[in-house]
Amino acid sequence: MVLSGDFPLGTDIKSIFQIEDTVFEVDNKSLTNRPDLWGHYGIAREFSALTGRPLRSVETADCAAYAELPPVEIDARDTELLYRYTSVKLRNIKQKVSPVNMRIRLFYCGVRAINLLTDLTNYIMLELGQPMHAFDLRRISSVSVRRFEEPFEFQTLDGVKRSIDPATLMICTGDTPVAIAGVMGGLDSEIEDDTDACLVESANFDGVSVRKTSSRLGLRTDASMRYEKILDPELTMLAAGRFIKLATDIDSGVEVVSSVTDCYVRRYAPVVIDFDKPFVDRYTGIDLSAAQIEKTLLSLGFTVETDSSRFTVGVPSWRATKDVTIRADIIEEITRIYGYDNFAVSTTKSALSPVRPTAAASDENDAKNLLVERFGLHEIHSYLWCDAKRWKEIGLPIEDNVRIVNSINPEQVCLRNSMIPTLLACVSDNKLYAPEFGIFEIAKVIDGRKPDGTCNERKRLGIALFSRIAEEKTLYFRLRDMLACLGRTLRHEAFTFEHTGAEHAWQHPKNTVSVSFRGTALGSMSALHPLNRNLIDKKAAVVFAEIDMDALSLLDGSEIAYAAPSKFPGIDIDLTFTAAMDVPYAELEAAWKALECEFLAGVRLVGIYESGDSNAVTVRFTFVSEEKTLTRAEVTPYIDAIVAALDEKGIRVRTQ
């Protein structure tokens, strides 16, 4: 190693190069929302305000000195996503390697040194927080900022060919793209070993656009992370001047061959905030002097005009993009510089009033408690987006689902429109861990779009039961009892079940019923279609239900009428009906509901047994009187009426 200067033997190399460094560990939770703190100079500004020490200004070249030189040709075609574009051309760059001290600093910041021009852009980005880019001047003579109407492929600096869509803002020379605005440059215009002239870009782009582009391409860079925070547009000229200053200091032969051309397309409106001292006293809880308030704000770069106890504060450009916009933000600045540890500890005094849960919230909590505590179901939590691959594995369609435009995972490209496929996927994942289990979830689905184009969000309850022990019919009626109990719990009246055909491909063509309450459709209950069941476990039974909780929350329940239990014993009579396999239980139920009996206290399904091509359905009728002990003869007329009504429909009563 050849050193410039005369150093005595034994001189510690640490005193020659900036190898030793001081590291400040800053526990700053607000860094994400402070674009000015994404550069060392912004942190230095904070230290200056906290310690009261003066802040040194950044050494830059006088950009006005080059005003007579030819400008860089900048065509700002897209004035929506471009805020400001500053550019300058440099030639006669002989030195290719950055100074040792610069390379050491870059290393300490986790950045690999490449060459002088690239290192300068990275150094200034770390120093000021302003991303920059240097193009080889042999491949770019003018600048055009635009979007393309048709998609195309573009190879970035990392050598990857990326698909560019019409929403992506590009930097071009003429009509040839050379960089993805705010994200990464192109391979064809990168700085090479023999590059001796460059065009420097210092720009400000729309932060939301950069974030979407970065997410869409799966390409997150140091530059894109800073642009996402909505940078100060005033930084572009400062960074350009800093680049010229460092380049000419390091390589004295560097020539600036253009003016520092500044295309300021969109300006932020100045932010001015008015407040008075009583406002500060009320929100801080301490009595700060007007002079102390003014000194604090001035140290942070704010401009302050005072009139007695009133303040008119101008927010500096590096805080005005999204950070400081209202009076409460000023209070935060004053209190954090004053020091939160300097506030006296006091008990908070505030009026507390009970919060009454909404009907929807009460329904959700009551439903969860019932399903977990009484029926032993497991609550799951799943994502709103669905895994297309998993849905296809269990034979579920996704053609009608709302699509995600910029999905990060290529398999998760749509949003679910039903809870059932999510539950079935969970059943498939857990089928090997238990021979029998039940799961449920209350969550949102996207049921198409509203007339205005927005997504139609609905909150639904999904339940799924799985068993390799119980038969499908047993599991089916177990779920039916759960839903009936749910209706009585939430609205003091059981839901109504009516046999219907399958509406979805995964529903059983015969074992599917609609669920309603007083004529309002709430959802459906079904066994899993045999074809879909084979994809999960052909030896197991799977049943499921889906209830629209939003629709239920709009319905009022029955009034709870208290009735003292009778002091006289009741009579239980079991009847077994023989019906064809395709006769639903609701048809039997309609027979006794149509008859009036003052003694009938309850009806319960005891069991269903298959016998050849028919079902044997056992039902228990309970009769109770408030005035006396009933005899069999007193309830026989009602039993005979039920038998006669069902006999007309071809449903017989078994006598043995």
Which residue stretches match the model-derived regions?
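Glycine-rich, charged/polar anion/phosphate-binding loops
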Residues: 8-12, 72-75, 154-158, 180-188, ...
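Short beta-strands and strand-coil junctions in structured, solvent-facing domains, enriched
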Residues: 32-34, 187-188, 207-208, 320-321, ...
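Extended, well-folded interaction surfaces typified by the phenylalanyl-tRNA synthetase beta subunit core
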Residues: 42, 273-277, 281-440, 622-624, ...
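Polyanion/phosphate-binding surface patch
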Residues: 210, 405, 435, 439-473, ...
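A conserved active-site cap/scaffold subdomain adjacent to cofactor or substrate pockets
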Residues: 226-240, 460-487
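A carboxyl-terminal module marker
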Residues: 299-302, 306, 312, 454-456, ...
